[in-house]
Amino acid sequence: MPYLNRQGDVFVLYLGNEGETDNENRFHPDWIDATHALLDEVEAHEGPAALVTTATGKFYTNGLDTDWIFGNLDRLPGYLDRVHTVFTRLLEFPMATVAAVQGHAFGAGAMLAIAQDFRVMRGDRGYYCLPEVNLNMPFTVGMSTLLTSRLTRQTAVEAMTTGRRYGGPDALAAGIVDDAVDGDRVLDTAVARASALVSTRGANLTGIKRGMHRDILDALATKTDESNFKFG
């Protein structure tokens, strides 16, 4: 399950199990609940603050929990709507958010990164990838709007329709990430960026973000059903 650490006024949300490396950090329903609980804890803190998300080992996050999905196909629409709530939470979070992408970010994990204000990626290893086209899995209304709004149009076309794997330098060139640095500098670089923005924390920032992301937020609030999503 995810856990929190803190560096000064910056909260660091680790997406995997404490003390373990190379977890895929997939979005199991329990993981989603735990993530929301930790974000509640961060929001309850008073004073200047910012948020960094990261993980340890090979994966930032591999996205949807496919094992859970195939065991619960009848619950897939509700599960996807629950995933949307994490993206929504980050898009309107009342403090600066920075994804420290130290490993692979695939599928919904790539979307988790793009739902944050800024992204720092490892430059020498790891990929940013949307493999849905190769898995015969469509994007939900909310996911599609998130990606086409947060990426440039041609980058979205390439990423969503070809499943291209972007290494750090390519992701930087495509505007997917804001920095691509050596592996041992990813977290420090993200924390430094977040630290410079702790004074922006507050309701005004949430209002600004809601105005900026209104179309995405409305799309993420669209209920997933057979009229707009068909898997398999």
PLM region spans:
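Terminal peptide-recognition signature
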Residues: 13, 35, 53, 65, ...
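Catalytic-core regions built around general acid/base machinery
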Residues: 38-41, 82-94
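Short, active-site-adjacent cap segments at secondary-structure transitions
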Residues: 58-61, 106-107, 215
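Conserved CoA-thioester-binding segment of acyl-CoA-metabolizing enzymes
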Residues: 1-54
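Glycine- (often His-adjacent) and acidic-residue-rich active-site loop
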Residues: 27, 54-85
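Amphipathic alpha-helical segments at domain termini/boundaries
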Residues: 1-14, 159-199, 204-220, 224-232
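Crotonase-fold acyl-CoA enzyme core
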Residues: 92-200
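Charged catalytic carboxylate motif
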Residues: 30-34, 82, 89, 189
